[in-house]
């Protein structure tokens, strides 16, 4: 099974390119983040027209996650994480697809720090770890895919000093991510490229793409 994760940063604005990418690459499952639309605004027909079923967890103007599956509609298992009933951010969606448990994750950024946004990020990561443990206990094939907003190691960023003060690579958030690896989850990209130097994000400002000034914050954790 080919599983992809893609922070689309606004599904309506990038729908033509997203459809083009689906047709070109034909992933069996695609986890989307930052769809930035309410549930009723999700363009389901556009995906059905190219052979994909979908479920989604939307939010007006912010956040939002979705799971697309080729030739089937994912069977929803969970929407949101337990632990903070007052948390209304649409950041987590979980489904079964052809015998595999799939989660689409948009973890909080955490900037600026210190402060409530970073504290929220750490609490959210602990809630995710608890849910991951529940999935692990089911002893089923599973992948937790998405934008984790965490640079796990220095080899995952073009210049560690340039990002040293960012919430993406603070010791606390890195430790929370590594704790999940310690629980048994496998970082798929790191397993394939242990030397690092593989980026999933480049800032659109200051010519980051042209300079290859990127970092790795999008991860697929496998059971």
What are these regions (language model features)?
Residues 11-13, 37-40, 113, 151-152, ...:
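Active-site environment of divalent metal-dependent phosphoester hydrolases
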Residues 1-10, 99-114, 145:
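Active-site-proximal beta-strand elements of phosphoester/diester hydrolases
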Residues 82-83, 108-125, 162-166:
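Surface-exposed cleft-lining segments at the edges of enzyme active sites
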Residues 1-49, 56, 63-65, 180:
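N-terminal, active-site-proximal structural segment of metallo-dependent hydrolase catalytic domains
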Residues 3-7, 22-40, 102, 131-154, ...:
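Active-site beta-strand/loop signature of hydrolases that rely on acidic residues for catalysis
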Residues 50-51, 124-217:
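Metal-dependent phosphoesterases centered on the DNase I-like endonuclease/exonuclease/phosphatase
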Residues 35-38, 42-112:
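Structured beta-strand-rich core segments of catalytic domains in phosphoester-bond hydrolases
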Residues 61-76, 196, 208-223:
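Conserved beta strand-loop-helix elements of the APE1-like EEP
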């Amino acid at each position: 099974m080919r599983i992809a994760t893609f922070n689309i940063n606004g599904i309506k604005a990038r729908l033509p390119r997203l459809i083009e990418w689906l047709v070109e690459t034909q992933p069996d499952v695609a986890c989307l983040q930052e769809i930035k639309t309410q549930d009723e605004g999700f363009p389901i027909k556009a995906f059905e027209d190219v052979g994909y079923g979908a479920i989604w967890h939307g939010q007006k103007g912010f956040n939002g996650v979705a799971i697309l599956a080729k030739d089937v509609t994912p069977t929803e298992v969970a929407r949101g994480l337990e632990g903070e009933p007052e948390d209304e951010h649409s950041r987590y969606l979980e489904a079964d697809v052809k015998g595999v448990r799939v989660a689409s994750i948009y973890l909080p950024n955490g900037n600026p720090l210190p402060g409530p946004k970073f504290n929220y990020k750490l609490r959210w990561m602990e809630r995710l770890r608890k849910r991951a443990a529940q999935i692990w206990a089911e002893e089923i094939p599973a992948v937790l895919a998405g934008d984790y907003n965490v640079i796990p190691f220095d080899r995952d960023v073009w210049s560690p000093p340039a990002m040293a003060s960012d919430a993406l690579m603070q010791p606390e958030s890195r430790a929370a991510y590594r704790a999940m690896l310690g629980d048994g989850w496998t970082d798929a990209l790191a397993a394939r490229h242990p030397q690092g130097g593989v980026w999933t994000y480049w800032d659109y400002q200051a010519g980051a793409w042209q300079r290859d000034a990127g970092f790795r914050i999008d991860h697929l954790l496998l059971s």
